[in-house]
């Protein structure tokens, strides 16, 4: 059994200025104000439409992100219906195969400290689940049948593609203090990364949500 930390990877090449210019070009059609486009007008225009709540314009650019997280967190991610997803399938992935190292991979729980009794109980439970999974496969079960005993903390990979408007909605929900701690564990660093690469778009998301997990 392998234990790893969750992480994200932005797969879409991001040029912040080019993104703002693209959004401005689309948005100015509404007002037929294309003549006001300059080399420096995009940031002000985009900030203005966000302030006015005209966020439909932000739907003209998509970003794809790869999430490596546990199955429980993935269930929260895919609730965002205005997005497209591909996810590692426990129906077809047979973790007894060499390609998976003949072991399951689980996500380290952020709420448990390594070496404590809670950590040890969790680790034993995961190993028992792995053992039961392999025994079911040996007995003749298919991966989609044997997966019934796999833990919620099983590592999964999710590809999420969403437009900028939906990413704003995602971050407002998933970085909030009320969000699940393991959801915040991946969402907050991702928000920081997007803010650093795409100016203006995420600047108004409350600073209180940026606390370190």
Positions of PLM-derived features:
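Family-specific signature for flavin-dependent thymidylate synthase
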Residues: 1-213
């Amino acid at each position: 059994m392998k234990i790893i930390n969750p992480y994200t990877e932005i797969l879409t090449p991001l040029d912040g200025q080019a993104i703002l210019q693209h959004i401005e070009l689309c948005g100015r059609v509404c007002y037929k104000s294309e003549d006001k486009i300059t080399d420096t007008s995009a940031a002000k225009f985009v900030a203005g439409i966000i302030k006015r709540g005209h966020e439909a314009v932000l739907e003209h650019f998509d970003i794809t992100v790869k999430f490596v997280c546990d199955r429980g967190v993935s269930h929260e991610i895919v609730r965002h219906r205005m997005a497209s997803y591909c996810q590692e399938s426990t129906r077809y992935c047979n973790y007894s195969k060499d390609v998976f190292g003949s072991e399951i991979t689980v996500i380290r729980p952020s709420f448990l400290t390594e070496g404590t009794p809670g950590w040890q109980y969790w680790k034993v439970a995961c190993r028992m689940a792995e053992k039961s999974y392999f025994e079911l496969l040996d007995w003749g079960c298919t991966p989609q049948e044997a997966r019934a005993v796999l833990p919620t903390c099983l590592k999964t990979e999710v590809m999420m593609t969403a437009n900028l408007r939906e990413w704003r909605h995602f971050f407002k929900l998933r970085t909030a203090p009320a969000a699940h701690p393991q959801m915040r564990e991946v969402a907050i660093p991702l928000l920081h990364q997007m803010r650093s690469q795409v100016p203006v778009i995420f600047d108004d998301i409350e600073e209180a949500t940026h606390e370190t997990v």
